[in-house]
Amino acid sequence: MSKLQKLELTWIGKDDRHENLEPRILIESPEYSYGDTNTENIIIHGDNLLGLRAIEDKYTNSIKCIYIDPPYNTGEAFENYDDNLEHSIWLDLMRSRLMILRRLLREDGTIWIQIDDEEQAYLKVLCDEVFGRSNFVNMISVNMKNIAGASGGGEDKRMKKNCEYILVYAKDYSLMPLFNGPYAYTEMSDLIQQY
């Protein structure tokens, strides 16, 4: 009897389990709250893995749309986080969070993940594994800045990066609702003249 084979991304530490992380108790801070006191919306300040574990039991299978903007792993160090991780560590960081995020989604829910080209290809394969390749909806290219030709205004002669991507996955593609039709493009000057 042969073992069922599948395509998957592997790396050192992939099989180390994070499910044993104890969920944390969230403490409400009224000084940061405003608006409708009966809303179910929450903002969690802290490590996102611990925050996800804290809400997992209450919100499993209940969130319709998730948007995340994870670290791009650009090789830089920022004030609030290190964006220079070894690729296997970055993949492990993403996988542990994506597994929880998938459990949080409703059956007709979608997740939207913004990323640049540094880890986009690896993230796509990882998401195929976590959400299922058949649940891939689309990859949207987002123009981040206008550049003047390949030189980007003349600072050097290499091609410039001017776009990022949003990977869109459904928890179950067959249950995902249809999108509204596209909006007609209107020039800003025409919009201003209307008012």
Where are these regions (language model features)?
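Conserved nucleotide-binding/hydrolysis micro-motifs of P-loop NTPases
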Residues: Y72-N73, D117-Q120, M144-I147, D172-M176
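A short acidic (Asp/Glu
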Residues: A54-I55, Y122-L126, S151-G153
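Flexible, glycine-/basic-rich loop-and-beta segments that form/coincide
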Residues: A148-Y195
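Conserved Class I SAM-dependent methyltransferase catalytic core
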Residues: H87-S141
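Short, solvent-exposed loop/turn and secondary-structure capping segments
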Residues: E76-Y81, L123-V125, M139, F179-P182
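Short secondary-structure boundary/capping segments
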Residues: T60, Y81-L85, L126-F131, G154-M159, ...
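DnaQ-like (DEDDh/DEDDy) 3′-5′ exonuclease domain used for proofreading
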Residues: M1-Y67, T74-I89, L93-S96
